[in-house]
Amino acid sequence: MSKKLTFQEIILTLQQYWNDQGCMLMQAYDNEKGAGTMSPYTFLRAIGPEPWNAAYVEPSRRPADGRYGENPNRLYQHHQFQVVMKPSPSNIQELYLASLEKLGINPLEHDIRFVEDNWENPSTGSAGLGWEVWLDGMEITQFTYFQQVGGLATSPVTAEVTYGLERLASYIQEVDSVYDIEWAPGVKYGEIFLQPEYEHSKYSFEISDQDMLLENFEKFEKEASRALEEGLVHPAYDYVLKCSHTFNLLDARGAVSVTERAGYIARIRNLARVVAKTFVAERKKLGFPLLDEATRAILLAEDANKSI
């Protein structure tokens, strides 16, 4: 590799590449979440019959993974570059490999392996066939074909490609610690994120108010249900995300027993399933506006025949 791309150049390169493949460039969703998959741009849009092609950077918070900034590769918050394409292109793997070439990684010169790793997210009732992508022995991407999202079978199938940007940048820039990654010319990753990483770790493991978090979870859960009773999918899903992040903080604090943990996950999953069903019903009422006219007419006619 002649030129070592900065972190922001990696993002710009991926944005331009996936834009050229027909993806809309979305912005990060303004709510805490543990993965880019939980953004409504993936979770909601992966269900139902409408096509959807989008790419976006998603900061992802995982309180239990915080290490006070002392671990070179494990973080409270990391960045994912998320690509979702529905229906999945038949050549999605080739498109992905071509994206690596744009980053200066020639697949013919490196050991790139697709290692089977089927994916599941119990808290949202989602699962799919998946592979980890390993580059010279290091995982850099998760590849998933969604089979179920929010408890609903996906049709058509959505392909998700999730790049781990810190790992990818560490490889491209040949550094051992994420904090040594060059974010922009002359500015290191650690100069931006090391202090927040330490502070969030300290808060998550030592300072957070368990009683307040438990109370918040109950309030967020009730508010999600209340919004759903009014048919308000998007506000409800915001509160599902808040429930998820609050649970993750409780889990990091050690405030949840093994038995309670399963119960909390089930409560989040039940809400997510209702959100998913309500979203599809909402889109159906609108006549699935992103479908082309011919497909929409066929689909709505089939639904009409089923109800007779």
Swiss-Prot record:
Pfam families, per the entry: tRNA-synt_2e (PF02091)
Known catalytic reactions: tRNA(Gly) + glycine + ATP = glycyl-tRNA(Gly) + AMP + diphosphate
Xref: InterPro entries: aa-tRNA-synth_II/BPL/LPL, Gly-tRNA-synth_heterodimer, Gly-tRNA_ligase_asu
Enzyme Commission identifier(s): 6.1.1.14
Gene Ontology terms describing biological process: glycyl-tRNA aminoacylation
Alphabetically ordered keywords of this record: Aminoacyl-tRNA synthetase, ATP-binding, Cytoplasm, Ligase, Nucleotide-binding, Protein biosynthesis
Keyword Metal-binding (UniProt): no
Enzyme class: ligase
Family matches, as Gene3D superfamilies: Bira Bifunctional Protein, Domain 2, Class II aaRS and biotin synthetases, domain 2
Family per similarity comment: Belongs to the class-II aminoacyl-tRNA synthetase family.
Protein name: Glycine--tRNA ligase alpha subunit
Gene name of the encoded protein: glyQ
